[in-house]
Amino acid sequence: MVWDEIEQGKFIDGLSGIDNIVVRTVKLKDLNGGMIELLEYESHPQPLETLRPIVDTGVSHFAMTVDNLDETYRDLLDMELIFNAKPAISPDGNAKVCFCRDFDGTLIELVEVLN
């Protein structure tokens, strides 16, 4: 994790198009410079009526590879992301995998390639 900050003010208001918005921004960076950004709109929470099932139509989740899934899992747990289960090794032994949900309930598949 390279950034975990609360952002607010004119710049964020202008960028989002919403006045008085407060955003928690978390940035995760891998060793090769790849980055993912997670946003939580703290000033404008939206209730999650139901979480989308993984078999729903449309984009149900996105996947990303990580270098060390156990470390990533611990870091994301510390940021209070919700996981379906702990990381597990695939039946073929080629990958360690788990699913979590971001602050808005979007499913994220995390994969560590083992072989």
Q: What is the role of each PLM region?
A:
Residues 1-33, 78, 91:
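Core segments of cupin and vicinal oxygen chelate
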Residues 18-24, 102-109:
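Short, structured secondary-structure boundary patches
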Residues 30-34, 40-107:
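Vicinal oxygen chelate
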Residues 110-115:
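Short beta->alpha transition motifs characteristic of CBS
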